[in-house]
Amino acid sequence: KGPQEGEDFFVTCRVGGGDGYTTHVRASFAYVDAEKGGILNNTRPATDKDYSGAIARCPRPVVGHENCQFQIYPDYGQISKYTGVLYPYNLEIFRDRLKENHLSSQAKSFHQATGHFSIECYKADMEYAFRTPGFGGFQLLDLQDYPGQGSALVGILDAFMDSKGIVEPETFYGFCAPLVPLALMKDHCWLNTQRL
């Protein structure tokens, strides 16, 4: 429906009233919700794009809803932390599938690789927001994993608010802080023959 009468700001992942990615105010979506999963998955990596076109469609400040949802392969060492009423059936199923496919020895590598890639995606998603003049901000789904009603293993912390060991707080603060230095460039990769 878009912004409603009486709202001081509009919290959304899309502003509406346009096609493709022109209305998006977060960089990734499920593939069923946006073409090829959104801007971050389907456009050439660059640091010169923002959400200006989307927020120009809205008469009040726009806040990005549930930005930075990037899956991290689970660390099965956390299963032993579940000692209360919650039981990690989901994690056991994932672990058993890995074992059935003779990949258990790679579990830690999968966790680390997806974790580090997730941090790069967090950074890119946040920088889209920070580059957008007049953007009202963003809210994350969560900093911790959500183990209920369908797993959302998208946090940099596990479900117990413990570090997953993939990023130090100082590093995270380097790209998610009140002041973040940004450079506007059409590419992420440059040749030594090109001028910046």
What are the functions of these language-model segments?
Residues 140-196:
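Aromatic-rich peripheral "rim/lid" segments of glycoside hydrolase catalytic domains that contact
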